Amino acid sequence: MLTMSKFKLPSDRLWPRASTLIKPNLKKADIALVGVPAHKSSISPTSAHLTPKAIRTALEKYSTYAGSKQIDLRGLNFTDLGDIANPDGQEGKKRVHKKLNGVLENYQTLVALGGDNSITFSVASALFPDLSKVGLVTLDAHHDLRDGNTNGSPVWRLIQAGLPGKNIVQIGISDFANSKEYSRSEERRVGKEC
């Protein structure tokens, strides 16, 4: 059986691959990628820690050009800051904060590749110590308003840390994917659900 990891894509100078844009550890760049392969706090078993590597591998299949918008990404500088080792739990949160402290001073945009969505809290709180001026858009079937430190709680933890609910937009919230008790409709006052 032939898998993508064993298959070598042909080289074509007229088809620049997205993966070739990313240079490791540039001191300054327009966009920086960082892997945050968290998975141990997931409510259900997961292999989410494999996602950063899978995304990087998938970039080998994509070009740099968005034809519908006529935008070529080759004009931007991309860098890869690598993966944050063992990002789970309180010690992992400290490692995330250490790695991301001041990162937006050198990189215009940071793309954090999870892991499970527990990284939302660690990454947002590392980048924005004052959450009162931050907005959050989630793409998820779940509200993520559970108690505790799991992949089901990052939005609630951010609200408790100072993120105003009115600054949150949740896209994809599904019926039968959340409990009435964890909807926390009065406490969270989420700005918009789509």
Where are these regions (language model features)?
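Conserved alpha-helical scaffold segments that buttress catalytic/binding sites
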Residues: 2-192
